[in-house]
Amino acid sequence: MEKKIGPVKTGKRHELPWEKFEIILILNLYFQLPFGKLNHTTQEVRKLALLIQRTDSSVALILTNYAACDPYILQSGRTGMQNGKNVCKPYWDEFANNKEQLFIEAEKIKANLLHSTLEIQLGITGENLMGLTQETVIKQRVNQNVFRNMILNNYDFRCAITGINVPELLIASHIIPWAENEENRLNPENGICLSPLYDKLSNIGVQLYR
């Protein structure tokens, strides 16, 4: 099980102006978290803060700036943090309708910060690509990882049916299968968190939910 990360209250870069790569990484995280987890206690926020050497509170603040740019959040009657919104708005406008490009770009940035490569981080180095191009496999892996993060966070890392909360035993299952509807592959409303047994039952057509 993944080790929990404690509060990141100081960072080597906490007094420096925000850079483009940081704002992109935070937007990438924004699209993978529900509104209720845009705070400094969320493990993914702490992990990113540690990676970019910022405080967890400062990363959480940028996340709420992005919420102030999000029409879905605003239409629901909720508001993000308006102060600082202008820093995030250009990146929102660039990537909100091109999330796949954002997710790939963010993973490249992470790999670079870890002194690694995207291929190594995704575990596809030297792999038999089964006739697919490396670019296609990278895109699939990144999108699948993002979808998993979205769904597990939305369900608070619990199987929707059994309540089991062991991440290694949870699957981000598509309601409409991945191969059948490209438009909804990354739509969190098309996902449900299941244990392996119920995921397999779903895949063979057993109706688990209405």
Label each residue range with its predicted role.
Residues I120-I164, I176-E189:
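Short, charged surface segments at domain edges that flank catalytic/cofactor-binding sites
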Residues P71-D93:
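Short Lys/Arg-enriched helix C-cap and helix-to-coil transition segments
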Residues N28-H40:
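Short helix->loop/beta-hairpin flanking segments within DNA-binding domains
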Residues P7-L29, I138:
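Short, Lys/Arg-enriched anionic-surface-contact patches
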Residues D56, C193-Y209:
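Short Cys/His-centered divalent metal-binding micro-motifs
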Residues T55, R158, I171, L194:
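The −1 position to Zn-ligating cysteines in a subset of zinc-ribbon hairpins
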Residues E44-A49:
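Short alpha-helical "recognition helix" segments of helix-turn-helix
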